Structure formats: structure tokens, C-alpha cells
Regions:
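Extended accessory and catalytic-adjacent subdomains in large enzymes
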Residues: 234, 239-240, 280, 284-287, ...
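Charge-rich, intrinsically disordered N-terminal extensions
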Residues: 1-351, 371-372
Length: 509
């Protein structure tokens, strides 16, 4: 370990003192006894050994090398890189760190960015736990252990490292620390509070059996919980679907048609300003439709006797259906032109970021996302699920040989995959992004189950679903000098689709 004289003597002194206290040789110490000697912080170690407390890392190295000590998560904060230097040597440690730097650069990280030191420490921690100084031999189980039981300051970095190694082909798939550390499942809140146990058991059984899209199952699930609270208060004798009659179903339709925001629900802080106002017609119709789906499935699966027809009873009345129709929230021509100009002229200085640190996403990717949102006419989910190589060019005989840009759109909630012509600027900006896009690992398409190369991926992760609404649109509004809200409300991802569709519908040709 090439220790200097002072820490060398201090280490011998400290271990000798502890052997005398414990009345046994250091190689007979248990993991718990080593943890007690090493202490959970540098300050506690200094306080324990006084003037000879300047050698904590050397004591850890001796425990690791000579006695198989591996309870490193109990040691609190320490410099994993320096401990690796002591036990693996500088040559092996620096070679591993250099290999990690190459892999990070390959997936889009900026070399020398001080914010990435945590990833290096996570690698060193994994090598120490596996006793293996090669990044290629780190396994995902070790990183998951660090993310769940390791020091708090390394948990997020361990998940990030897993995605970097997955992108480099070391193992199949990384993991997301934020998902695994949620206190409850996504968007679950306290949704089952006050729902009768018997009704809840039927709902959970239906939820586990249904083969609809996950988003459709989730939407239906929350409506069923709302219905359960309504039953507990108004029809406690019908908390089992088996006890429902035609009259119960009609009572639910009546209640749904008069439903107000926050009624029969446990919304927490959501919709606080609108609470108590009448729900939108489409939302009230959804309450009826989802309960209809529930009873239709139960009867089709033979789980309950047929006492009424969901198709005839659980349907929206005409008075409600007539209130539902197309209502595109288009952006005015003036604001739309400013947004288009902003999207075509984004510069590095327009991207928010800390002083001295670049924006998380590359400029080329932000430009491609902006232009695709402004000209593509796609849903947010379709934009974020676009695949590499989605742009093709076709010569046109009618336009003096000018090329037509064709774009492959992935499977959506209403259509199979298809190809559509788009403005050439979309193809230009997407191809510019593909030229600088770092190689990324294959990921599973949540709709089709295929392993694909998503176009908008960076540092081993897809662009988050909230990025367009919460980051990109405000960025374009700021660049264009317009407010984020207009006469029709907040400018969101879907309003671009509504605006483009309305423009095409009203066009002469």
C-alpha cells in the first residue's frame, strides 16, 4: 500500500489497541467487530483513537485484504477511489476508471464534468464488493445492492452506472433508482382508502386478469375505486358485484351524470382549485364507460350471474352524449408562428443550465424534438417512441425532382405503425441529431414489446414523458417571448397536434 510512516504506525497502534480490548487477534474479528473498529464516520474514528486516528482508510484496507471484510456500506462516507488504489494498485484502478470514462463518453457524458464523480465512486464501490478491478465484470446485482443498501450518496449513481454498462453491452438492462425507491407505486397515492374490502378484492382480481393496455387498466381502476366509495355510502348492500341489479346500475349512471370534481375520491392536493365544480362531460361519460367495461368483463368471464345488460343500462344518456364533441384547443396563428421561429432558431445559449455546466440534453436533440413537435402532428407518446432510422427520402417527379421526406410513426393507441410525409425540415433536424447521437442500448417498446433503438435517448435513458410539457414547451415559449398560457389555457404537447390538424382541415387543398 506504500503507506507513509505516520499512518503505518497509527494503523499498527490502533489494531493493537483493539486486539487488547477484544482479547483476540485481528484475524479472528467478526464483520461486526471490524465495523465497530472502523466506525461509521471519519470523525468518530478520530474521536475513538485520538492522535492515531489519521489512518482509517489503511485500517479498512487491511480489513479488506487480510480478513475478507466486505461490509463497506456500514462505513458511511469514505473515498472509494482511494481505497481501490490501496487494495488494487494505481495501475488497475486507473485503468478501470479510464475504461469507465470511455463508456460514459460513448453514451453522451461530457469528459471532465465534476458532477460525474459519483459514478466513478459507484464503480469503485462495486469493484470493492466483488473484489474484481475490471468494469466488465461488474454485475447488475451488485449495483442493485448498492442502490438499495449502500451509502445514500451512491444510490442514484449506482443506477446511472447500471445504464451506462448496459449501453456498453456488459449486461442486458440497467435500472432506474427513482422507480425502485418510490414509497408507493406510480400515481397510486392513497387511492384505496375508504374502499370496501370486498369491492376492492373484485377490482384487484379484474385488474390482474384484464389484457387491456396498462394505461386503460389504470384509468378504469381509479374509476372503480371511486365507485366503491359511492357504494359504501349509498348502497352498502351492493359492495359485491354479484349483488348489483338493474336499479343499482341505473343509480350509478345518475350519480355519474351529476358527479363533481373531488367527489367520492381521495385526490390529496390535486384539483384543489376546481374541487366542487361539475366534472367535464367527457369525464362523466368515462365514469359510466369504465364501470360498463368492468361488468361486461365479469359477465363474459363467468365470474357473476347476468342480472342486467351493461350495454343497455351502463351507457351515457343522450343528454350527456350531446355535450361531447370535438373541441380542438388550437394555438392562434400569431403565437404559432412565433413558436415555429423559436424552434427553428434554438441556440446553445437558450438552453437552461448551471454556470460552467452544459445543459443535460445535447442541442441537436432539443432542436430535433422541437421541430418534430412543431411540424409532426404527433402525440407526445408517439414522439418519444420514435425510432432511429425513422426518416426516409423519396424523389418526387411532380416537384422537379425535389425529395419528399417520409417519416415512420410507431404504433399508437388508435393505429398500427404507418408512414407519413412531413416537412423536409423535420428530416433535416432528425438526421443531424442521428449524426451526433451516442450509441445506446436496446430498450423494450412498452406498446409492442419489441427491443428497439429509440431515437430520443441520452446517457442510457429515454427522454422522460413529462419533458415536452414541463421543459421543452416552456423553453420555446421563453425563446419566442410569449406566455405559457393563452386564451385556451396552458400550451401543452397535444395543442400542437390540434393546431396542425385544424390547419390541414381548413386548408384549400
Amino acid at each position: 500500500m506504500h503507506a507513509a510512516r505516520a499512518p503505518y504506525n497509527s494503523s499498527l497502534h490502533d489494531i493493537t489497541v483493539e486486539m487488547q480490548r477484544l482479547r483476540k487477534t485481528y484475524w479472528a474479528w467478526t464483520q461486526s467487530e471490524w465495523s465497530e473498529v472502523i466506525c461509521s464516520t471519519e470523525g468518530d474514528f478520530h474521536q475513538r483513537f485520538g492522535a492515531s486516528g489519521n489512518c482509517r482508510q489503511y485500517v479498512m484496507a487491511l480489513a479488506w485484504l487480510l480478513c475478507g471484510f466486505d461490509r463497506l456500506e456500514s462505513c458511511g462516507v469514505f473515498y472509494q477511489y482511494r481505497l481501490c488504489l490501496k487494495v488494487f494498485g494505481r495501475q488497475h484502478t486507473d485503468a478501470a476508471v479510464f475504461r469507465l470514462s470511455e463508456m460514459m463518453t460513448a453514451v453522451g457524458y461530457v469528459p471532465g464534468d465534476g458532477r460525474n464523480n459519483g459514478i466513478r465512486n459507484a464503480l469503485c464501490m462495486a469493484m470493492l464488493l466483488q473484489r474484481e478491478p475490471q468494469p466488465e465484470r461488474v454485475n447488475v446485482d451488485t449495483l442493485q445492492y448498492i442502490a438499495s443498501a449502500g451509502p445514500a450518496y451512491l444510490r442514484k449513481s449506482a443506477a446511472t452506472l447500471s445504464r451506462i454498462l448496459a449501453s456498453s453491452g456488459i449486461f442486458n438492462e440497467g435500472f432506474d433508482y427513482r422507480v425502485s425507491q418510490r414509497r408507493r407505486p406510480p400515481r397510486e397515492y392513497n387511492a384505496v382508502t375508504d374502499v370496501p374490502a370486498e369491492w376492492l378484492s373484485w377490482c384487484e382480481r379484474w385488474r390482474a386478469t384484464s389484457v387491456q393496455r396498462p394505461s386503460s387498466i389504470e384509468a378504469c381502476w381509479y374509476v372503480l375505486l371511486k365507485c366503491g366509495r359511492w357504494l359504501a355510502d349509498c348502497h352498502p348492500e351492493c359492495v359485491s358485484p354479484v349483488n348489483w341489479t338493474r336499479e343499482t346500475a341505473m343509480a350509478w349512471v345518475t350519480a355519474a351524470c351529476k358527479m363533481k370534481v373531488g367527489e367520492w375520491s381521495n385526490p390529496g392536493g390535486m384539483y384543489r382549485e376546481r374541487r366542487g365544480s361539475m366534472m367535464k362531460p367527457s369525464a362523466r361519460a368515462g365514469l359510466i364507460r369504465h364501470v360498463h367495461t368492468f361488468f361486461h368483463d365479469l359477465q363474459e368471464w363467468g365470474w357473476m350471474p347476468v342480472k342486467f345488460s351493461p350495454e343497455r343500462i351502463l351507457r351515457s344518456p343522450r343528454s350527456l352524449s350531446t355535450q361531447i364533441g370535438p373541441d380542438p384547443r388550437i394555438v392562434s396563428d400569431e403565437l404559432w408562428c412565433k413558436l415555429i421561429h423559436a424552434g427553428q432558431n434554438l441556440q446553445e445559449t437558450d438552453l437552461p443550465g448551471c454556470v460552467g455546466y452544459p445543459y443535460f440534453y445535447p442541442l441537436e436533440m432539443v432542436r430535433a424534438l422541437s421541430v418534430l413537435w412543431l411540424f409532426g402532428g404527433l402525440r407526445r407518446d408517439e414522439i418519444l417512441r420514435m425510432r432511429c432510422g425513422c426518416i426516409r427520402w423519396q424523389a418526387s417527379e411532380e416537384n422537379d425532382g425535389q425529395r419528399i421526406c417520409l417519416m415512420d410513426v410507431p404504433v399508437s393507441k388508435t393505429y398500427a405503425a404507418f408512414t407519413k410525409p412531413v416537412d423536409s425540415i423535420v428530416g433535416d433536424y432528425i438526421e443531424r441529431w442521428e449524426l451526433v447521437r451516442s450509441p445506446q442500448a436496446l430498450q423494450e417498446d412498452p406498446k409492442t414489446g419489441e427491443s428497439v433503438h429509440f431515437l430520443f435517448m441520452h446517457r442510457g435513458k429515454r427522454v422522460h414523458g413529462s419533458y415536452i410539457n414541463n421543459s421543452l414547451v416552456p423553453l420555446l415559449c421563453k425563446k419566442a417571448g410569449i406566455p405559457e398560457h393563452d386564451a385556451r389555457g396552458r400550451i401543452t404537447s397535444h395543442r400542437a397536434r390540434a393546431t396542425i390538424a385544424s390547419q390541414l382541415y381548413n386548408a384549400r387543398e
